[in-house]
């Protein structure tokens, strides 16, 4: 067996297929099969590995969380969360930018998807901000960068995927770990928005009214309760992440159809069809990534990667920066789920060897991937934001540059201050 040739076929073939614009799941599958053929591995193992890859009780939560997000996102919740955020922070300088950021924090806890956040909130907030005197490119930049908060704020199906890939981490602990980093990201984006708004004389909203805030909170409480059901239920040990997700789907259906009345039954079937499309992609990717991960382990790629990185420096700070750099580069050329599935088995052992907790590393991975969603050439959220605003992508990227800095600062704080991620899980889970 020529190990070097097998590694070249696996990694080189995968990168080649990605650059040739093959769907990621196909690129993973083809490169894995080619590697197994070169290595002389029995291909009968292929099906067994794929079935095993998706035969996880924890992963059953993924379709439920995706369905919950789709139902809530289409059920009239966006406007109510925007009104709630407006009553809370609309009075500040650059009020609508602050509303955008805070609404994304709320909405992220329901959808768990940056793309859904950008499409749903962006279609409402970008025109609203432009009408109030904000530049269109600034409005779009705020929308797409704040959408990344939703990746950190639970419940997030990407957190479930990471928890499973990393070796059955506690999903509840990972959920709790996302709240403070998500708030930190929101705060950093608000600081950036305030500075730009002050410089450009963007308007303030109405003066803060406690009565108005309480009224809007009462209107939005049905949606926010879905988050409470999931997180409190999982953390409190009442039910598992999968069970909580299933309950949340039923709750979301009731709220969207009967309380907010944003969906009729025809709309429900349409939403479920969209969920099936999304879910099929995710599950195929998880199944093929299980084969890819087997090939990586068989060829000792994680060990080689660890030796290669530690040979560059034995300084934990430098290694942590290198890990972030690798994840940022991957984020520029790949979508989020494949990065989690492929990079975690390789990079997590390196991270733990320098004292980074697996839960903290999960938050780092997710935020790095989020930044990648805003970065060309793949940048799916960047493309969605540009399409919603009807602006050239280059103009949106230019307006986003100051917010990249805010996100990098947040990433570095999360990397080098473990308690930002670990304090809440340690407090409530032990």
Task: Say what each PLM segment does.
Residues 1-430:
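Alpha-helical transmembrane segments of multi-pass membrane transport proteins
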